[in-house]
Amino acid sequence: PPRPAAGSRANESVSCDLCHTISAIHSDDKFPYNFSFVSNPGRIKYGSKTGVKSPHHDTEKLDIFSQAELCANCHNEKNPFGVWVKSTQIEWLEGPYSKQGVPCQQCHMPKAWGRNATMANEDMVAQHLFNGAHDPGKVAGAIEIRMHPEEREVNYDGTIVLKVQLFNGKAG
């Protein structure tokens, strides 16, 4: 995609305010991509829960914060030639978790007891850790490897031929 205009929201990178001011997804295509969200900077911060109170801003629950399409805006990307260079959410759609109704947030932002802001009450909150391929705990067990020799007995100085199979253990 073309470079964002100087001083635009697209230059802010990932931040609390950027994500929590997304109020809608706008995409004419089958999948959201290339930052196709609508951002409304201001006093209202959006999220997945009702009843959240803050002395600094208003809050509003939006269903998109519990849907994989929210993540697709940044994790699906086409280059200027129409070629997918990132298709994370599209791959998720083709995988088992989509079919089971498990959105990205359930694994990459697991809920745990804590606070989502310093002035908030303790509650079960989405951890903003975004665990993924950079997290050894997430990667462990993602692929199951099975090896089967073609022959059960091999001479000591012989060559063994193995059939290797890889299975998706838990990758989205």
Predicted regions and their residues:
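Primarily the internal scaffold of c-type cytochrome electron-transfer domains
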Residues: 2-172
